[in-house]
Amino acid sequence: MGKITFYEDRGFQGRHYECSSDHSNLQPYLGRCNSVRVDSGCWMIYEQPNYLGPQYFLRRGDYPDYQQWMGLNDSVRSCRLIPHAGSHRLRLYEREDYRGQMIEITEDCSSLQDRFHFNEIHSLNVLEGSWVLYELPNYRGRQYLLRPGEYRRYHDWGAMNAKVGSLRRVIDIY
């Protein structure tokens, strides 16, 4: 079970709203979000309702302003609790529909370019666990939540291009 609290003002001030499960529309409860406290679980927060728009991965901890989660503004409109998994396994393909060279990953990778000479991934298959895909190396840039399932094209995970820099397993160990 997870727990996340959203605050309208920086430094955990102002009106707040607490969640313990997925919420597709936070707009009725908060006009803006400038700080977040994650008491338990791993969460993905989204700038738009219905889990759309830019997304940001949050682990247990305090985020006193939106820049701490690399947000560009004070808009948080939906959130999703990421289920914990014991093991993680992911297959990446250089072409759409699982074609081309394939690599399998079971650990975090800070640079796909350095480790595998890949900087574009056109399809992938999450076999176990949840992952966060980052557009840039060293866990930077746009973030995308990957849950178990098939992603035949980069549009399937919400990306606008096939650029992939790094991958991180969702593990709540902190």
Swiss-Prot record:
GO biological process, any: lens development in camera-type eye
Organism from which the protein derives: Bos taurus
Pinpoint the Beta/gamma crystallin 'Greek key' domain residues.
2-40, 41-83, 88-128, 129-171
Task: Tell me the segments the record calls region Connecting peptide.
Answer: 84-87
Q: Which GO MF terms are attached to this record?
A: structural constituent of eye lens
Listed name of the protein: Gamma-crystallin D
Cited function:
Crystallins are the dominant structural components of the vertebrate eye lens.
Q: What is known of its domains?
A: Has a two-domain beta-structure, folded into four very similar Greek key motifs.
Give the top-rank taxon of the lineage listed in the UniProt record for this protein.
Eukaryota
Q: Which family does it belong to?
A: Belongs to the beta/gamma-crystallin family.
Q: List the disulfide bonds.
A: none
The UniProt keyword set, sorted, is: Eye lens protein, Repeat
- InterPro entries xref list: Beta/Gamma-Crystallin, Beta/gamma_crystallin, G_crystallin-like
Among the Pfam families in the record, one is Crystall
